[in-house]
Amino acid sequence: MQLSIRMQAVADMVTPGGKVADVGTDHGYVPIYLIEQNKAFHAIAMDVRKGPLARAGENIVRFGCSGRIETRLSDGLERLEPNEADTVIIAGMGGLLTVRILEAGLEVLK
């Protein structure tokens, strides 16, 4: 999996070996890359829109990551439980939306 320079920079910041939640996953490429590179042993790909989440699911299957990446329809962090992820990725969104997601998900992030 080849990532864009921007998404590669995001993936490079992930501490290896944990569980990753990708908020606003869109195509699912970052969690797929992290699984392929063994930087994560499990990932949750989340998106608020059904269409992008369906495409992410198709990509997850196509790249052979079905057993290690699950998809969730979620507005921000609302479908993530405490301790389900060591790392949360929120990338490609505006600052105000990112702040709203973080504020709404404070209990999950503690």
Regions found by a protein language model. Give the residues of each.
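Conserved SAM/SAH-binding beta-strand->alpha-helix loop
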Residues: 49-51
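Glycine-rich SAM-binding Motif I of class I
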Residues: 28, 32
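A short, conserved alpha-helix within the catalytic core of class I
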Residues: 96-105
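Conserved class I S-adenosyl-L-methionine
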Residues: 17-26
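Short SAM/SAH-binding signature in class I
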Residues: 85-92
